[in-house]
């Protein structure tokens, strides 16, 4: 159910991560307060994100350039930032975008959990899954970032 493939080289992923890591906290939205991502049982997770309209132009342009090419238009790019203890509850994103591809910027024994498995993070690799797919992020033990490419929002 999760399709994985290499999108960019590890060095490029790490370089992008390093540039994102120095962004001021003011760029981020606290997703436990704004644009809540509620779980299947109403839980509220804890993590931060930046939507593409708030990103510095050079980073935004780079993300749009490296985005996987799909049959639906790329309509939004979001960066999720996870600090130690941050998490996202089990949920399905069945509204808004029709399709999602997630790029990881570092290697981790942690990753995307879903019914039936765990897909570990690999720097430079993408995970793709349908939006009605139940998935979550367990409380993280190491800080990390994910770039979320959303396709077909509003179609």
Language model region names:
Residues 68-155:
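Catalytic core of non-heme Fe(II) oxygenases with the double-stranded beta-helix
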């Amino acid at each position: 159910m999760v399709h994985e493939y290499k999108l960019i080289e590890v060095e490029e992923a790490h370089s992008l991560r390093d540039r994102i890591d120095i962004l001021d906290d003011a760029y981020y939205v606290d997703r436990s307060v704004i644009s809540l991502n509620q779980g299947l049982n109403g839980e509220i997770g804890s993590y931060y994100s930046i939507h593409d309209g708030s990103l510095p132009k050079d980073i935004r342009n780079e993300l749009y350039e490296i985005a996987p090419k799909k049959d639906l238009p790329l309509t939004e790019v979001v960066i999720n930032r996870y600090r130690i203890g941050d998490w996202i509850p089990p949920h399905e994103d069945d509204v808004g975008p029709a399709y999602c591809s997630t790029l990881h910027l570092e290697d981790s024994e942690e990753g995307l959990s879903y019914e039936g498995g765990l897909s570990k993070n690999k720097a430079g690799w993408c995970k793709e899954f349908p939006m009605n797919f139940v998935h979550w992020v367990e409380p993280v033990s190491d800080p990390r970032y994910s770039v979320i490419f959303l396709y077909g929002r509003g179609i």
